[in-house]
Amino acid sequence: MEDSKPLTVSEVTRILKNLITGSKDLKNIWVRGEISNYSKASSGHIYFSLKDSSSLMRCTFFNYSNKNYSGKPLSDGKEVQVYGTVTLYEAGGSYNLNVARVEELGQGDILLQIEKLKQKLAAEGIFDPERKRRIPSFPKTLGIATSPSGAAIEDIIKIARSRFPGINILISPCFVQGDEAPDSIVAAIEELNHPSWGVDVIIAGRGGGSFEDLMAFNDEKVVRAYANSRIPIISAVGHQTDVLLSDFAADYSTPTPTAAAEYAVPKEEDVLQFLTQLEGRLKTSLLAKISSSKDRLRLLSGKFIFKEPMQLLNQRNQRVDEIGVRLQKAVFNKVGLARVRLERYEDLTSRMRNIFFHKKQKAEFWTTKVEDLSPPATMKRGYSILRNQKGKIIRSPEETKPEEELQVLLSGGTMQVIRKGK
């Protein structure tokens, strides 16, 4: 074994190719999966990867085969089944499926999940244009959330420095793909939002990549971090697809990191020109204000108050004195009128008191008279009342009969009597 001649890479590759091409299990087979990394060359050939939950396989759909395809346009995320033969590309040492037919099975699970999340966030108002902030025209400090080793960071810094050399740049490094990317991007954005850094605008993103490479920017946590950023944020992910949810949540989105830097950072000459124009406008406005103030001063200086200020003051003092005298008279008149009314009221009260006293005396007099003439009072003076058995008052002897029993009412009580004689 140790003395056997070592094989070259090409020899090993040819052996593998013979094994693959000689296997009936890899010829004219149907393979089902989800399209990713889709691209179409100028030659008309279509290249894409077919994947499932754990594996990825490269596919080539040559123009002489795909010209017969009449289904919906192929794109990343679509679930399809393809018919073809597995081959091995010797120069690259990788296997490939040469596709003869493609049948679309429906939209891929990933795109469906993204669409559901998009609808959910849209219903919450995350993508509403009204909540987007204006990107500052003249930022002092630019914050960048991206990979520290990618081409994106170099492009952003290069463009920013070339446009405005004096701008402050603060980098918050993060992963931009893989399982750790979502939490890392969120942490980077939150760090740049800390008030102590004084960041005016944030660029968050990465350079181009495959559909899978960009999936972190469709993660719900990342999208919400874009939307919740206290500082205006620019999405800067290099892509040609329209399904990146972070683009919708950002205050402004650009197709590349370079474009984001150009939008966020003004040119120094433009800033100087703006300041020069602003200085001119301020100077013009100030001169106009001074001229207007001079005209007003000239107009006011010709008025009476400035010519004879003491005379005007004397007139005002005289007017105050006149008003004081009138006010004093009015007060005195009011007091005098109130005094007269009070005297009239007191006189009326005295008269009413006298009338009441006389009326009371008269009432007491007649009350005494009435009481003196009442039957009980009369009987106290020696009088009596005579009644027959039926209770009728007897006023003369003719109203009684001999031997008739009668009742006598006296002051102290009653007694029974019998008439005697005729």
UniProtKB/Swiss-Prot annotation:
Swiss-Prot/TrEMBL catalytic activity? Exonucleolytic cleavage in either 5'- to 3'- or 3'- to 5'-direction to yield nucleoside 5'-phosphates
InterPro entries with a match to the protein in the record: Exonuc_VII_L (IPR003753), Exonuc_VII_lsu_C (IPR020579), OB-fold_nuc-bd_dom (IPR025824)
Q: Which CDD domains match?
A: ExoVII_LU_OBF
- TM ranges are none
A Pfam family found in this protein is Exonuc_VII_L
- One GO molecular-function entry: exodeoxyribonuclease VII activity
Enumerate the subcellular locations listed in this protein's record, separating them with semicolons. Answer: Cytoplasm
What cellular-component terms does GO give this entry?
cytoplasm; exodeoxyribonuclease VII complex
Q: What is its EC number?
A: 3.1.11.6
Key words, A-Z: Cytoplasm, Exonuclease, Hydrolase, Nuclease
What's one GO BP annotation on this UniProt entry? DNA catabolic process
Entry similarity comment: Belongs to the XseA family.
Q: Subunit composition?
A: Heterooligomer composed of large and small subunits.
Instruction: Write out the function statement from the record.
Output: Bidirectionally degrades single-stranded DNA into large acid-insoluble oligonucleotides, which are then degraded further into small acid-soluble oligonucleotides.
What is the protein named?
Answer: Exodeoxyribonuclease 7 large subunit
UniProt gene name: xseA
